[in-house]
UniProtKB/Swiss-Prot annotation:
Residues 164-261 form the HTH araC/xylS-type domain. Homodimer. Keywords: Activator, DNA-binding, Plasmid, Transcription, Transcription regulation. This is HTH-type transcriptional activator CfaD. Disruption phenotype: No longer transcribes cfaB; in a strain that also has an H-NS (hns) deletion cfaB is still transcribed.
Amino acid sequence: MDFKYTEEKEMIKINNIMIHKYTVLYTSNCIMDIYSEEEKITCFSNRLVFLERGVNISVRIQKKILSERPYVAFRLNGDILRHLKNALMIIYGMSKVDTNDCRGMSRKIMTTEVNKTLLDELKNINSHDDSAFISSLIYLISKIENNEKIIESIYISSVSFFSDKVRNVIEKDLSRKWTLGIIADAFNVSEITIRKRLESENTNFNQILMQLRMSKAALLLLENSYQISQISNMIGISSASYFIRVFNKHYGVTPKQFFTYFKGG
């Protein structure tokens, strides 16, 4: 079911969002259409959305209150994700999940109602207290009916691939002028070997580099601490005007439009 779209200023459409970290998103102030693999999920306000790592999505977001941010996002780093996965495997008596199984969008992106009290506890935990965060997230998941798909998705998101190793190398210094040759040297193999291994995972060097640069740029914009020219240099693009064009082509919005919408005002 489609929701009613109102004024254009209340709405934004963003394309090509790569989920690099397993993400739990709470639609505190928006209604969101999520598009992936030619499917669409409509998520109404005050819902939880579980986004599997590695999923590429486009979203259309409509705010309820213009002066507030549209959602709250919890992005799980690798260590938190692994600890969460290990705990869930023990609690629910699961040994492993078939990572080669053909899985549709409904098993990679899941939405559910949320207990507001549990969510508030999660938001109020100190950002450096990983153990408390993991415990609260486990408890929240335990209160969700039919949570098997969520646990399966967390397990699969914790699996590391060769492309992840390439990302980790690049992420250490995004400002560097990366080439396939530099990556090959880092792994002490040929460029052809790098190319073939990435192709076996349905990706390539240029795609990984662009996704990392654009994802980092989006996060830096949300921090509201840097000028466009600074962000451009931080992600390895020397020209600010070129960065704006690339950002617009990738996401379908300019950096200014992106920042203005998500800053909450």
